[in-house]
Amino acid sequence: MNAATSPPIWSTDLPLPDRRQGKVRDIYTVPPREGHAPGVLIVATDRVSAFDVVMPSPVPGKGRELTAISTKWFDKIRSWDLIGDHLISTKPCDVAGLDKTHYPQLEGRMMLGRAARVIPIEFVVRGYITGSGWKE
């Protein structure tokens, strides 16, 4: 089943503690693996938010697209070698406490990260100038 044929994910219900639900993402505490600190699992659902309101109809595949955009930016920022980030993995098999039955739902829409103190800064990127527009 691919993103075009899979049903939209409105909400998740994983066997992990401390589930919190944002407007479009579900967040869980991930139990520590041996020698590691607890982590955080961020799952991008297909919920749609506009003007701080969650719309009643999800968009199939939206969570996967959000995750793809996020990981692209993490890769770009990492290539500059200026600052670290929280991202550990985007693979469901790396999440302690889950079994293989949860993998299809999470594939392409999750990020496993280090638990960290939140710095309340938000960046919104809606587009950027390239090509001849940048030269001017």
Language model segments and positions:
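Active-site loop/lid in soluble adenylation, ligation, and acyl-transfer enzymes
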Residues: N2-E136
